[in-house]
């Protein structure tokens, strides 16, 4: 009886930590304040529910605050989403989300999670700087789009291209980026609009 009572008690402690991320509203907006100015993303949960829910969770937690735009390829994409703190990033690295079907094409201004294969999306995002329909067949599922400030996104520093090493960013965080790539633009804050 004591063992059973202990197991029930333990279950009450463990189950809340296994809870699913909060469901995002059907439509919501996120205001990004960056080193180059503001831009706003409008998210449509019905486009990609798993992606929208993860994005909502990460923005609410402040995950993207002080994140660098570490991959900026003109006429292709702007990518970010590795936390400034390697310990925080390590915690999220294994928290993948299931793929969403691609219901919207990767047109200029849409936002989607980066992926390295089936069901591998975690925290990294990109905004399409051009129409990239070839990404649709690769499983990149847009969940929202930039509704204001696309000119800000297009003006982010692109001089380093794809040079920053993502492994080093994950291991060293912003210390690596600030010392090796000081010109990178960054997110000051990302907030859900009321």
Predicted regions and their residues:
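Bacterial N-terminal signal peptides
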Residues: 7-16
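Bacterial N-terminal signal peptides that target proteins for export
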Residues: 1-7
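Cyclophilin-like peptidyl-prolyl cis-trans isomerases
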Residues: 15-194
């Amino acid at each position: 009886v004591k063992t059973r009572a202990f197991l029930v008690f333990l279950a009450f402690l463990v189950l809340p930590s296994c809870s699913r991320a909060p469901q995002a509203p059907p439509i919501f907006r996120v205001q990004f304040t960056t080193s180059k100015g503001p831009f706003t993303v409008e998210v449509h949960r019905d486009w990609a529910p798993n992606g929208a829910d993860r994005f909502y969770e990460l923005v609410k937690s402040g995950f993207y605050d002080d994140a660098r735009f570490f991959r900026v390829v003109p006429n292709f994409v702007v990518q970010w989403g590795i936390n400034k703190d390697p310990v925080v990033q390590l915690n999220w690295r294994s928290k993948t989300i299931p793929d969403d079907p691609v219901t919207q094409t990767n047109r200029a201004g849409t936002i989607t999670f980066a992926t390295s294969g089936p069901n591998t999306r975690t925290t990294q995002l990109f905004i399409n700087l051009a129409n990239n329909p070839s990404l649709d067949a690769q499983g990149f599922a847009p969940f929202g789009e930039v509704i204001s400030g696309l000119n800000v996104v297009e003006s982010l520093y692109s001089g380093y291209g794809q040079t920053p090493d993502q492994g080093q960013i994950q291991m060293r965080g912003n210390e690596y980026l600030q010392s090796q790539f000081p010109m990178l633009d960054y997110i000051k804050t990302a907030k859900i609009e009321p």
